[in-house]
Amino acid sequence: MSEERGVAAVAARGLFKQYVGGDGGVIHVLEGVDLELRAGEAVAVIGESGTGKSTLLHILGGLDRPSAGEVRVGEDMLWRLSDEALTHLRNRRLGFVFQFHHLLREFTAVENVMMPLLLAGIGWAPARERSRELLARVGLDRRFEHKPGQLSGGEQQRVAVARALIARPVVVLADEPSGNLDPETGERLHNILLEACRERGAAMVLVTHNRELAARADRVLRLEGGQLLPAHAAPL
């Protein structure tokens, strides 16, 4: 990679992932996947269910280890880090948005968003102020003190998006973030997520089944046969 282009926000090289099935056979999920994203770039990954899209995201986020290959976030090779250093990197430099929001139900919207900042050692008052500002940015300025059970599904996912972005991650990994939402709410959520990542200069990998929403990303790739291909490429 040239110095002129600089260091990628996240880069994967030669990723393989295999599992042993119940019958003892080997299941090949990823077969030499390469992927590189620059700061502020959004890449959508589409593909049939069971092709390994979520597995790829988990490996990029340091939540699962590849059978072979490497992942780099900035200058850091994930699998050369200690467990403590890897946890620190995930908390400070990566943001995760899943299909299920995983909000803490006993805490308010603003308290859920504050959590990453509090874990990073930021004081309560500045963490709360930053969280309120970001919740307002995603259209929840009247929902600061509502708990998840008092919010709609779309509102809960917007809280999850704010939580993913609050620590200003360099990479956001989003796995079907609108999968449980109606089309209109899902489209609104995707727009918020894309705009917020671009404004903050965060790279984003978005897994989605919705080709119309995927088309709004800078690139669209298809995971098929264990490989990432341009979405318009002929099937393997």
Regions found by a protein language model. Give the residues of each.
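ABC family nucleotide-binding domain
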Residues: 8-216, 220-223
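H-loop (His-switch) and adjacent beta-strand-loop-beta switch element
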Residues: 220-232
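ABC-family P-loop ATPase nucleotide-binding domain
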Residues: 1-18, 229-236
